[in-house]
Amino acid sequence: MKNESTFIDVPADSSSAMKGKAPLIGVAKDHTASGSGGYNRGLSIFDFLLRLAAIVAASVAAGTMFTSDETLPFFTQFLQFEAGYDDLPTFQFFVIAMSLVSGYIVLSLPISVVTIVRPLAAAPRLLLLVLDTAVMGLTMAAASSAAAISYVAHNGNQNTNWLPICQQFFDFCQKTSGAVVSSFVAVVFFMILVVLSGVALERH
């Protein structure tokens, strides 16, 4: 009968086994969190690189449009034929808007660095999402309006008797068209940035 009393050790083993299983649950959660953090950090690094590329695109757009002035080599006693961005309010708006966009991207770089250091922080990522969306709208408005004026400069408008001027002001049209293309490249970068922020927030 005394030998049968040895079966009381079984509950102790089961309880110790249950105690041993508890830390494993915590370890699994830690691995999940670290995996999500690593994924978001990768997105944040890509976000930072895209912002550097967007700075280049927006700065090139503003600078090219700003230096697009052209003066024809011939003139009369009373007239000098010159074309510049400041002759058209749309191109003036374009230069101002793209300059503001460039400044914003520079100011957003520290926030992007914060998302790299703290990949699971939602507040900086949400702030970037809201601001990037607003600035993307400004960039798209400037690019679209400048593209419309550039089209008229190249092709004219028969309904309103607006003649194309690019045959005379070739360099001016080339620079303004290049600025418009660069601004649309910046728009594409902003679209990708907004998508990245949305994906990163979804992973939180």
From Swiss-Prot:
It comes from the Eukaryota. It holds the Pfam family CASP_dom. The chain crosses the membrane at residues 42-62, 93-113, 126-146, 179-199. GO terms for cellular component: plasma membrane. It is a multi-pass membrane protein. GO terms for biological process: cell wall organization. NCBIfam families: A_tha_TIGR01569. Belongs to the Casparian strip membrane proteins (CASP) family. This is Casparian strip membrane protein 2.
